[in-house]
Amino acid sequence: MKTQATLLLALLIGIPVIAQEDHSEFIEGPFASPQEVTETCLLCHDGVDRDIMQTRHWNWLGNEFVNSEGEKMMVGKQNLINNYCISLNSNWSRCTSCHIGFGWKDDTFDFENPNNIDCLICHDRSGSYKKSPTGAGMPDPSVDLVKVAKSVGKTTNRSCADCHFNGGGGSGVKHGDLTASMLNPSPALDFHMGKLGFTCSDCHAGENHQILGAGHGSLAAGTNHMSCLDCHGEEPHRKKVINDHVNAVACETCHIPTFAREEPTMTWWDWSTAGQDKTVPLDEYGKPLYDKKKGDFLWEKNVVPVYKWHNGQADSYQPGEKFNPEQALELNRPGGTMFDESSKITPFKLMRSKQIYDPKNNYLILPKLFGKDGYWTTFDWNEASKIGMAVNELDYSGEYDFVYSRMYWPINHMVAPAKSSLKCADCHSQKESKRLNWEALGYKGDPMKVGGRAK
């Protein structure tokens, strides 16, 4: 390949290719496939493929841990269930449009082939690179691979936004604190990014492509955390009385008083109403309230978080795990209590849903949604359940119903300016606090009156 010859020549005559930020003089193409782009990248970036293959972004799994049954486990997007589009397995080609690889269309994907790594999805600086929404991670056919490869450099906010701002199928669907409004936020929306010019990588960059930050897979293992205190220290305030809260209250609790402040976020998804031919007007924010493929939705803006004690860990519902359908199923359960000194009162987005389950086996159904035989094409829940459960190697009784579920999503972004943070009276006042339910948190009343965990 012409490009390979150019790069090899550069290496032989001592040009510092790796340190060279402008790649345009080394990249020539043409490229018959995106894998050829990766092959070219690895000619100089030797060993990077081995690093990437150890990451959560590549494997969609967190660290190994031992569960309450004494079993070793690794969990992540590969095997966790949510109450949005439910499950990866049998729906690969749609879900893996956000994978940092090429061609993960079924369970035969080769995680050991370095040429399957997509360097461009994170390092494109042309602004023109995009994945095909249903192409199993392959680039959209319109992408000019040579142009994009010549542009590569350090990651940008858009690098992260393309996937993380659009989780669940669109901006604000999954994350209430990560939406399109965060691409160029005002200081009022996010002080660090809007006022100080922070990028995602300023906080999240780790070593060897190990991006910092605990998603659901990391929460299960209790690893890969980062904290405001990493930069601000244990006594970030001038007043001691406020610093006394740091050991029991997460920084985000006061400094992110609400989320989805400029763009709404989805808070309810009812799969049981899907399949109907009806027209429902858009809501006050211009968001859909109904989709035949997916059912009814509810969107909210300027949302007050739900607060729970959290110690950095969480238990998650596992495929095939039985539950009581008379109660709302919690798909993840943030760990921590008032009596656990590693726990802090922490803000979450609560996502509520009504999703499909097997009433005879009393566990969730993982339906096939995408593809010619998926529910989004056939509108046949029974067939979609049969196919999806077979792929997941779980028994399907032939009966289905719908159950209420809840899922907690940590709130870490949209840090407001200090003047907009919560004040003492927002939580402690003569009247009953409308923000914090002290009894639900384990207190007998307002801890300012009855005592708490402050130093």
Segments (PLM) and residue ranges:
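Positively charged n-region of N-terminal signal peptides that target proteins for export
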Residues: M1-A5
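Bacterial N-terminal signal peptides
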Residues: T6-G14
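Sequence context of c-type cytochrome heme-c attachment sites
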Residues: A19-T156, D162-H225, L229-N243, I345-R352, ...
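Repeat-solenoid scaffold signature
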Residues: N224-N332
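Short, well-structured alpha-helical interface segments that form or flank functional binding sites
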Residues: V246-V249, S343, K419-L422
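Long, compositionally biased charged/polar accessory segments in the mid-to-C-terminal portions
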Residues: L289-P334, M338-T346, M351-Q355, P367-M389, ...
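Terminal low-complexity/disordered tails
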Residues: A416-A418, A425-K434
